[in-house]
Amino acid sequence: KGGIVRDPVSNPPARILLDNPRKNAGRLSVNETDADVAVATAEVRVRFDRSTGLMTVTDLRNGKEVIKEVKGVDFQKNRTTVTLRNAVGEFFYGGGVQNGRFSHRGKRIEIVNTNSWTDGGVASPAPFYWSTGGYAAMPYTFAPGAYDFGSTDKNTVTISHEMPYLDLFLMVDTTPVDLLRDYYQLTGNPVLLPKFAFYEGHLNAYNRDYWKETTEEGKGILFEDGKRYVESQKDNGGIKESLNGEKQNYQFSARAVIDRYKKDDMPLGWILPNDGYGAGYGQTTTLDGNIANLKSLGDYARKNGVEIGLWTQSNLHPVDSIPALLQRDIVKEVRDAGVRVLKTDVAWVGAGYSFGLNGIADVANIMPYYGSDARPFIITLDGWAGTQRYGGVWSGDQ
């Protein structure tokens, strides 16, 4: 049965593992000789050499030695490093969303929350990798790390995290699918997004900018009234946009966007009308007034087969010290306005590690509870192992 698995340090608290990640491994056998000590199930044997303390792991289903430790664990005050064999023809994948990188043989990857969305950045790290040699590894930690798959020594793999102890899950299976299933057994299956999420989404800000008519050649955007307009985040003397077009500004509204998709027979699944800094979703003097404005858009959108969502620049729950424009109340947004999509921002999850996991776990529970059992649709980044059970990960703003 095993004992209690010690959770890694996390602040704020978050859970990498599911509540019940164990499965019955069958009968365990322990074999001791003068040379080594081995623990085995019917499928896997873990052996420790008495003279060196080094570990080898064998897949008994095919007799293959899949993991071989080539150097003792290096314990430093603020870092622990494991060194394994890097076999000829062995390839490595994982580490989360490593922008522009997916096959890591001969390379070093950072398991670090970099808040970088371009080539080589780490949009959402995960302390996990799998090998074509028949194994996978997941350090059980929220600490930053680095995995070197032969960039300095082509014959070794090093797993290093900023922690003074070693806590590591090893998984043994022959196919990538089975290794991923092992990982999901520990951390949870990827969330199944709602049906509307598989249709096109439209993300923009429709509660902030001003549109001023221009006759200058080659400038502006052509609208339905036959005129061209220049957009500005500052008041340029033009018409200010809104969600519902209630201020004689329909063609600059979020409702107009929904109508354009319908007019052009383009299936639209969801819309985020506040995807821009300082946008908000209403122009009244109170949070409740703005939520009523959001609900009005939601009712119109749902009548046209579209769900609404929000980009989350601000805190999810009310903070009295900030203006009504940027106030948030996630419960009322979901329960009253009918919000069914949330896209995170660095202001919410940007600290990463346990912070990123903690924040979306909260919303993943709020959405079905206050949203009539709605399936959560969270678009996120800056995650960790376990993020996949709550939301879909994107690569960030390029």
Regions found by a protein language model. Name each.
Residues L186, R260, D264, I366-Y369:
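Structured segments of extracytoplasmic/periplasmic soluble domains
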